[in-house]
Amino acid sequence: MADEEVQALVVDNGSGNVKAGVAGDDAPRAVFPSIVGKPKNPGIMVGMEEKDCYVGDEAQSKRGILTLKYPIEHGIVTNWDDMEKIWHHTFYNELRVAPEEHPVLLTEAPLNPKANRERMTQIMFETFNVPAMYVAIQAVLSLYSSGRTTGIVLDSGDGVSHTVPIYEGYALPHAIMRLDLAGRDLTEYMMKILHERGYGFTTSAEKEIVRDIKEKLCYIALDFDEEMKAAEDSSDIEKSYELPDGNIITVGNERFRCPEALFQPSFLGKEAAGVHRTTFDSIMKCDVDIRKDLYGNVVLSGGTTMYEGIGERLTKELTSLAPSTMKIKVVAPPERKYSVWIGGSILSSLSTFQQMWITKEEYDESGPSIVHRKCF
């Protein structure tokens, strides 16, 4: 089955974007929004060939006439019919491959419910007829892609953030922490604070513009209060941004106020602890003997960790929480936006991994529950 010439497919299903491609590549071939759109008023255009559903970029570009849904919320699949459409689109439209000819590696959120892994397994074998598949935890793949097998991953994407301590390649489930604060919340917060400046962004189309402003202009201050003072005294931090209609807006302290919510969730009216505290709490739930290894290998992963200054700030915050003699190292790999996918590409190309696949035969013999025995 696992012949050298058959390439595995790697599909990382995020709340915001699907990253998909072929094992062995160094980056995903396809990255598109995890959206399914259905026409608001079906059949209104006479003689127009109208599909009953659009996926990804096409749904995004026709968003004016569609109702958009995200089938993955906070990292976990909540709508399986739409999820199936996304996978179908991934294989047939984006990668243009026949899934029945390739082993498929899928990713899942940490602490994904058992029933969900079984459902994924079932859909792959029964709907897409894959010859083999495997489900890997996203944060573990990120750690592999950084060349480590022990460390703590702070993975923050569009829908959810997690801190996942990993020892010798295994995630420690009792110490995993989840924070429902991620990219989408920051985009909404950015809309809110730009509103206070007099820029009204409200529609879902305008939300995409704000997301772009956030991604291009935001950064994380080393010291928030100092930065606020500096921003009052000078206009050095102001940057301008050209909107699609040619208007130009100016963005000032919003540039660092927006992502500051990662460290101070109270900005969003959330009671949760910030990412630094969550990381610390996660480490403290681990055995005292491995904490030193975790503090020395804090690995950032996911699109919401792409802000300039995040590594320095996290180092500073962890240093003040940890014992004074502790050596703290925060690693921010440049490719961390796609590190989950890259880790999957590496893992599924290893010769030692080939016996780990769940094969069609094993599935037919044991049913969906095989996933709990073979993927952990």
From Swiss-Prot:
Which EC numbers characterise this protein's activity in its record?
Answer: 3.6.4.-
Task: List membrane-spanning regions.
Answer: none
A cellular component term, taken from the record's GO annotations: cytoskeleton
Catalytic activities: ATP + H2O = ADP + phosphate + H(+)
Main localization of the protein described in the UniProt heading:
cytoplasm
Localisation per UniProt entry: Cytoplasm, Cytoskeleton
Which InterPro entries does this one have?
A: Actin (IPR004000), Actin/actin-like_CS (IPR020902), Actin_CS (IPR004001), ATPase_NBD (IPR043129)
Molecular functions (GO terms): ATP binding; hydrolase activity
The record's comment on protein family reads: Belongs to the actin family.
The role this protein plays is: Actins are highly conserved proteins that are involved in various types of cell motility and are ubiquitously expressed in all eukaryotic cells.
Protein name as annotated? Actin
Species in which this protein is naturally found: Toxoplasma gondii
